[in-house]
Swiss-Prot record:
Organism: Geobacter sp. (strain M21)
Reactions mediated catalytically: L-glutamyl-tRNA(Gln) + L-glutamine + ATP + H2O = L-glutaminyl-tRNA(Gln) + L-glutamate + ADP + phosphate + H(+); L-aspartyl-tRNA(Asn) + L-glutamine + ATP + H2O = L-asparaginyl-tRNA(Asn) + L-glutamate + ADP + phosphate + 2 H(+)
HAMAP family per the UniProt record, alphabetical: GatB
UniProt EC number: 6.3.5.-
Described purpose of this protein according to its UniProt entry: Allows the formation of correctly charged Asn-tRNA(Asn) or Gln-tRNA(Gln) through the transamidation of misacylated Asp-tRNA(Asn) or Glu-tRNA(Gln) in organisms which lack either or both of asparaginyl-tRNA or glutaminyl-tRNA synthetases. The reaction takes place in the presence of glutamine and ATP through an activated phospho-Asp-tRNA(Asn) or phospho-Glu-tRNA(Gln).
UniProt enzyme class: ligase
UniProt keywords, alphabetically: ATP-binding, Ligase, Nucleotide-binding, Protein biosynthesis
Domain of life: Bacteria
Gene behind the chain: gatB
SMART domains: GatB_Yqey (SM00845)
Annotated protein name in UniProt: Aspartyl/glutamyl-tRNA(Asn/Gln) amidotransferase subunit B
GO MF entry, a single one: glutaminyl-tRNA synthase (glutamine-hydrolyzing) activity
Length: 479
């Protein structure tokens, strides 16, 4: 490609506070339209905002986790524009004094590490939502102000990404971090984590950025990548034809995989920012910052490294387990009761994840098999009470019923047979019924050994101890 792609991202994360940023209304998703509003949300004359302290705390968390410096004197500003879902005629945000600045995240892609700068993180309120009626013959749009005044952090990256894959790697890492911090539920479909992408092209070798287009409010990683890829092609075609890219805001259409013009792109001065006279500056002390720093959870990258260094887990296992804070906690809780890291990892990534996926993609928090129950099952397998194959059957029953593994094994008579006399009798019966195959095996066709093992296990209904079966069967066939 003769053009260098330049991408910067603006990510809006909706915070998991119970109430809004400047009033006491609920932030619960899915309520009846306009049922979670008050004079502040509605922008009524004389209504005064009161800052939610937890929003500031969450912003400090986000800043520390993304290597930002924390601004100790914070000022809120009014961002002035007119839109039907913005009843006040302005949005309360931050302008020249954002709460977090000069951070970075490191991404890993194809074995290489790259640092993506974070320009700023600032606190702001969300706007309402326009609902377009899907009724034949009705062209009206409705306004739902439940979302108005909901707390957001806007996380603005430097234009450091040079491909759609780098953008997605950065987004996924940021998504993982805000969920680990517990400040955002990360739900892209509900708009809790949404992204605007600024995309431009410049000639290879140049250090002067091209004219950018902003792609608005894209709510899935797949669509973000598609939107950026399309925009790169669109701009390259314009430049190849000798045209000029217009600075504008564009909307992505997931049905066609294309973007379309929405409006001309505004500059900061178009919003006529000025300090909000109804909100005093917020002073963040060193003690407050250090307290929040001390309460930060172990973040994904550190957890992944610890799983590999202290528990000797393979990189793949560590990556999968550390991807979700809840999954990692489930693994660690099980490991605390059954300290065999690789065995626990195999079961969590295998049977546990499979069962949850098959059950309408339930979350690990909803898993009916608790870490304690899973540890009990693994102990039965370790003691030789049940085989690995039977353990999977027992797990499925545990998932369905929530019963303890010991009870299921007892009720269904699944105790593993290790009695050498009983196993020898089964082996003798199998060899007698398959005399022809025995002759072939002894004639050099040793691949038949697995066939004999399978026949013995079938005769025992899966209860025979595989280790004992293998050892005794080998002696019989060699003798």
């Amino acid at each position: 490609m003769k053009y260098q792609v330049v991408i910067g991202l603006e990510v809006h994360t909706q915070l998991t506070t119970n109430t809004k940023i400047f009033c006491g209304c609920s932030t619960r998703f899915g309520a009846e339209p306009n049922s979670q509003t008050c004079p502040v949300c509605l922008g009524l004359p004389g209504a005064l905002p009161v800052l939610n302290r937890q929003v500031v705390e969450y912003a400090i968390r986000a800043g520390l986790a993304t290597n930002c410096s924390i601004t100790q004197r914070n000022v809120f500003a009014r961002k002035n524009y007119f839109y039907p879902d913005l009843p006040k005629g302005y949005q309360i945000s931050q302008f020249d004094l954002p709460i977090c600045q000069h951070g970075h995240l490191d991404i890993d892609l194809e074995g290489e590490r790259k640092r993506i700068g974070i320009t700023r993180i600032h606190m702001e309120e969300d706007a309402g939502k326009l609902v377009h009626a899907d009724i034949p013959g009705v062209d009206d749009s409705c306004v739902d102000l439940n979302r108005a005044c909901t707390p957001l952090l806007e996380i603005v990256s430097e234009p450091d990404m040079r491909s759609p894959d780098e953008a997605i790697a950065y987004l996924k890492k940021l998504h993982q971090i805000v969920m680990y911090l517990g400040i955002c539920d990360g739900n892209l479909e509900e708009g809790s984590f949404r992204c605007d992408a600024n995309v431009s092209l410049m000639p290879v070798g140049s250090n002067v950025f091209g004219t950018r287009a902003e792609l608005k409010n894209i709510n899935s990683f797949k669509f973000i990548k598609q939107a950026i890829e399309y925009e790169i092609e669109r701009q390259a075609e314009i430049l190849d034809d000798g045209g000029k890219v217009i600075q504008e805001t564009r909307l992505f259409d997931p049905n066609t995989g294309t973007t379309r013009s929405m409006r001309g792109k505004e500059e900061a001065h178009d919003y006529r920012y000025f300090p909000d006279p109804d909100l005093v500056p917020v002073i963040i002390s060193d003690d407050w910052i250090e307290r929040v720093r001390g309460e930060l959870p172990e973040l994904p990258e550190a957890k992944r490294a610890r799983f590999m260094s202290e528990l000797s887990l393979p990189e793949y296992d560590a990556e999968v387990l550390a991807a979700s804070r809840e999954l990692a906690q489930y693994f660690e809780d099980t490991f605390a009761l059954f300290p065999q890291a690789k065995t626990v990892s195999n079961w969590v990534m295998g049977e546990v994840t499979r069962a949850l996926n098959d059950d309408n993609n339930r979350s690990i928090a909803e898993c009916p098999v608790t870490p304690a129950l899973l540890a009990d099952l693994l102990k039965l397998m370790e003691k030789g009470t049940i085989s690995g194959k039977i353990a999977k059957t027992v797990f499925d029953e545990m998932y369905k019923t929530g019963k303890a593994p010991e009870k299921i094994v007892e009720e269904k008579g699944l105790v593993q047979v290790s009695d050498t006399g009983a196993i020898e009798a089964m082996i003798d019966e199998v060899l007698e019924k398959n005399a022809g195959q025995v002759a072939e095996y002894r004639g050099g066709k040793e691949t038949l050994f697995g066939f004999f093992v399978g026949q013995v296990m079938r005769a025992s209904k899966g209860k025979a101890n595989p280790g004992v079966v293998n050892e005794m069967l080998l002696k019989k066939l060699q003798g």
